[in-house]
Amino acid sequence: MKIIEGNLTAQGLKVGLVIGRFNSFIVDSLVKGAIDTIVRHGGSEDNIEQVLVPGAFEIPIVAQKMAASGKYDAIVALGAVIRGGTPHFDYVAGECVKGIGQVALNSGVPVSFGVLTVDTIDQAIERAGTKAGNKGEECTLAAIETANVLKQI
């Protein structure tokens, strides 16, 4: 029986980061975590391309264009949506996650979900590098591993 399993080697991988700028005081830490993770796992900053968009809602359409370009082995979506007093959070977060999932399925390029969807600023801070780790790092590891699995299939 053959078992296909990915590894965490980023050497030679071309990774696109699509970054929602809204809540940049949080997102900047996610981006740093993503870049550090790629480099720590043998990747090169020369093989990383950052594409900045206004916010989380715009991430899926840009990720779709990036995936269709054929330039990337993996795409990492990074952003932060923090709940406020209106239903706006639900619409933005829901459409973002749905759109990112569709891009991955339709393109065959792994698109890792590193968009924080949290109730409070404290929760966002925790997930951007303090108590709960850095979700930018975690989703980048998932993107690296998935890209390596797909290369074997």
Swiss-Prot record:
A Pfam cross-reference name: DMRL_synthase
GO molecular function ontology, one term from the record: 6,7-dimethyl-8-ribityllumazine synthase activity
Record EC number: 2.5.1.78
Single GO cellular component term: cytosol
One GO BP annotation of this record: riboflavin biosynthetic process
Residues given in the record as 5-amino-6-(D-ribitylamino)uracil binding sites: F22, A56, F57, E58, A80, V81, I82, F113
UniProt keyword annotations, A-Z: Riboflavin biosynthesis, Transferase
Active site (record annotation): H88
Pathway stated in the Swiss-Prot or TrEMBL entry: Cofactor biosynthesis; riboflavin biosynthesis; riboflavin from 2-hydroxy-3-oxobutyl phosphate and 5-amino-6-(D-ribitylamino)uracil: step 1/2
InterPro entries attached to this UniProt entry: LS, LS/RS, LS/RS_sf
Binding-site residues for (2S)-2-hydroxy-3-oxobutyl phosphate, renumbered to this chain: G85, T86, R127
Reactions this protein catalyses: (2S)-2-hydroxy-3-oxobutyl phosphate + 5-amino-6-(D-ribitylamino)uracil = 6,7-dimethyl-8-(1-D-ribityl)lumazine + phosphate + 2 H2O + H(+)
Assembly and interaction partners: Forms an icosahedral capsid composed of 60 subunits, arranged as a dodecamer of pentamers.
Family: Belongs to the DMRL synthase family.
Task of the protein: Catalyzes the formation of 6,7-dimethyl-8-ribityllumazine by condensation of 5-amino-6-(D-ribitylamino)uracil with 3,4-dihydroxy-2-butanone 4-phosphate. This is the penultimate step in the biosynthesis of riboflavin.
This protein's name: 6,7-dimethyl-8-ribityllumazine synthase
